[in-house]
Amino acid sequence: MSDVLPIILSGGSGTRLWPLSRETYPKQFLPLVGEHSMLQATWLRSAPVAAHAPIVVANEEHRFMAAEQLQQLGVKPSAILLEPKGRNTAPAIAVAALEATRNGGDPLLLVLPSDHVIRDEAAFQAAVTVAAAAAEQGKLVTFGIKPTAPETGYGYIKAGAGTGATAVERFVEKPDLATAQGYLASGEYYWNSGMFLFRASRYLEELRKFQPAIADACQKAWEGGKRDADFTRLDKDAFASSPSDSIDYAVMEKTADAVVVPLDAGWNDVGSWSSLLDVSEQDGQGNAHHGDVIQLDCKNTYAYGSRLIAMVGLENVVVVETDDAVLVGHRDRIQEVKEVVSQIKSAGRSEATWHRKVYRPWGAYDSIDMGQRFQVKRITVKPGATLSLQMHHHRAEHWIVVSGTAEVTRGDEVLLLTENQSTYIPLGVTHRLKNPGKLPLELIEVQSGSYLGEDDIVRFEDTYGRT
């Protein structure tokens, strides 16, 4: 389609899908429905209508995951813009629009959250075609989801008369149940999907008109950003000075050119484990299970795990198992998992933020055992990848190669280790690990010392800009 540029919004922590989704590995990077992550699925459904590779707006912490997941699809993004701090959707889209026009172009921006499920991709693409025609005429298009129930968790859009792209009469906040029932019965209202399409210049024009403080802060943040490798780091102070506002409040509710295009395509924003059950393939009793699950006489249950889960006589129950946490809850109250996450944070525990397995740009590590003055990790290093040149003040390390080849820098020495060989890194000695081979390197690391936290790392050189 002519000049459509997807803008994929990939911020957010997805705490309502804890323990699978956590701050350092949120839901948009997980394959919750199908084989691809939600970020990957967002690009794949938009690719047939796109004339450009996407611009991704992401959290600094998630930059390598976003780049790698698109790379797995053979896609090099037009840009990856890194937010130093979340400021809601209006600023995020503003910096994306500035980036989209930096070389003199003025594409149609297809703004897509990275964590939605859309079952009927053909219907979605047809709606984008209708929206693009309206955007070509200077309209700012939002996609309205045809409601299937009187949901109170969504905002609503009242549409004007007509078919195709029709004028937005008003945006409505999340209603109470009686009001939502009236909206559903009237046939005049749609759920607000959070997806948009408009010309980049038109969005910036309307933003400057209605929210000049956001426009000015984003201009400074983008102009003062630092570009390195595949990423653009927005200026921290300038971006933080922007008011935090959604595109709905900042622009769409104020502009005279807002139109809505209906979308009936099996949309779901996957805001809870209960909604994930709704979009998952179910058996005859309404059960949806992912992983190694055995159930007897269960109804309307959802289970997700890597180890064996056995369920007997349960109804309307959600069970989610990970390496270091298990969630069990009634489907009607599963949204309260956010309170659980708050309590975990208040207790100073790491499970709200980190998985046991932590992904890094060079690979991953899994903390398989830990005790007083020791920790054992399984480390995987990608072919050709190199860890930082570093040292530790409080711990020594023993490395045992399980498979692959390791090039180890230890002080002034450079060692080449293969399967079943090992080395020792004394406390205070500079060291580096590299995989010079074509296969993944796996090793076991045994740490010992008085303090084993990840912040006991002094980096001297780093391929990934973390020094």
From Swiss-Prot:
Pathway in which this enzyme or protein is active: Nucleotide-sugar biosynthesis; GDP-alpha-D-mannose biosynthesis; GDP-alpha-D-mannose from alpha-D-mannose 1-phosphate (GTP route): step 1/1; Nucleotide-sugar biosynthesis; GDP-alpha-D-mannose biosynthesis; alpha-D-mannose 1-phosphate from D-fructose 6-phosphate: step 1/2
InterPro entries: GMPP_N, Man1P_GuaTrfase/Man6P_Isoase, Man6P_isomerase-2_C, ManC/GMP-like_b-helix, Mannose-6P_isomerase_type2, NTP_transferase_dom, Nucleotide-diphossugar_trans, RmlC-like_jellyroll
Keyword field contains Methyltransferase: no
Molecular function, one GO term: mannose-6-phosphate isomerase activity
Disulfide bonds: none
Gene Ontology biological-process entries: GDP-mannose biosynthetic process; lipopolysaccharide biosynthetic process
GTP-binding in keyword set: yes
Superkingdom per UniProt: Bacteria
Catalytic activity field: D-mannose 6-phosphate = D-fructose 6-phosphate; alpha-D-mannose 1-phosphate + GTP + H(+) = GDP-alpha-D-mannose + diphosphate
Assigned EC number: 5.3.1.8, 2.7.7.13
UniProt keyword list: Exopolysaccharide synthesis, GTP-binding, Isomerase, Lipopolysaccharide biosynthesis, Multifunctional enzyme, Nucleotide-binding, Nucleotidyltransferase, Transferase
SUPFAM superfamilies xref list: Nucleotide-diphospho-sugar transferases, RmlC-like cupins
Cited function: Involved in xanthan production.
Family statement: Belongs to the mannose-6-phosphate isomerase type 2 family.
Identification of the protein by name: Xanthan biosynthesis protein XanB
Organism: Xanthomonas campestris pv. campestris (strain B100)
Taxonomic lineage of the native organism: Bacteria, Pseudomonadati, Pseudomonadota, Gammaproteobacteria, Lysobacterales
